[in-house]
C-alpha cells in the first residue's frame, strides 16, 4: 500500500481519536469535530477501539470485520449528502426512512449499503458515482 495512502488514513483516524478525546474532556470542538464526536457517541461498540493502536490496524470484511472508521465515515458522508440534498431527493428519502425506523441513525445504517455499492461501482469503473442509480437504490429501501 502506498505511503501517502497510509499517511492519509492515519491522519483521518487521528481526527476521530482527537475529536472523541476532546468531547470526553469537555473541550471546545470545531464544527467537524462535533459531527465526528456525535457519530462516535452513537457507536459505543467502537469506543474501546479509539486508541492510537487503531491507527495501523486493518479490518478485513472477508473475515466478518467492520472497519469502525469506514462505518463512521459513511455516517458523516450520508449526513453531508442529506444536509446538501445531493443527490437531489436524498433528504426526502432520509426523512421517510427516519420516520419508518423511528431513528435517523437507523435510517443512515439502511442507507449505507446503497452508498457503499455506488462508491464501489464507481471506483471499479473509474467513473463518478451514478447519482440517479444510487438514489433509485435508496428509494427502494
Predicted regions and their residues:
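Well-ordered alpha/beta subsegment
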Residues: 109-113
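Aromatic-anchored, charged helix-turn/loop surface patch used as a conserved interaction hotspot
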Residues: 32-98
Amino acid at each position: 500500500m502506498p505511503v501517502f495512502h497510509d499517511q492519509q488514513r492515519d491522519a483521518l483516524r487521528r481526527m476521530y481519536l482527537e475529536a472523541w478525546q476532546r468531547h470526553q474532556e469537555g473541550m471546545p470542538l470545531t464544527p467537524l469535530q462535533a459531527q465526528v464526536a456525535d457519530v462516535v457517541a452513537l457507536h459505543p461498540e467502537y469506543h474501546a477501539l479509539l486508541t492510537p493502536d487503531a491507527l495501523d490496524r486493518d479490518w478485513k470484511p472477508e473475515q466478518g470485520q467492520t472497519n469502525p472508521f469506514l462505518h463512521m465515515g459513511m455516517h458523516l458522508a450520508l449526513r453531508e449528502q442529506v444536509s446538501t440534498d445531493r443527490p437531489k431527493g436524498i433528504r426526502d428519502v432520509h426523512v421517510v426512512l427516519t420516520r419508518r425506523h423511528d431513528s435517523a441513525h437507523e435510517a443512515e445504517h439502511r442507507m449505507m449499503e446503497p452508498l457503499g455499492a455506488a462508491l464501489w461501482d464507481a471506483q471499479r469503473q473509474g467513473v463518478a458515482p451514478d447519482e440517479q442509480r444510487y438514489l433509485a437504490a435508496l428509494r427502494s429501501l
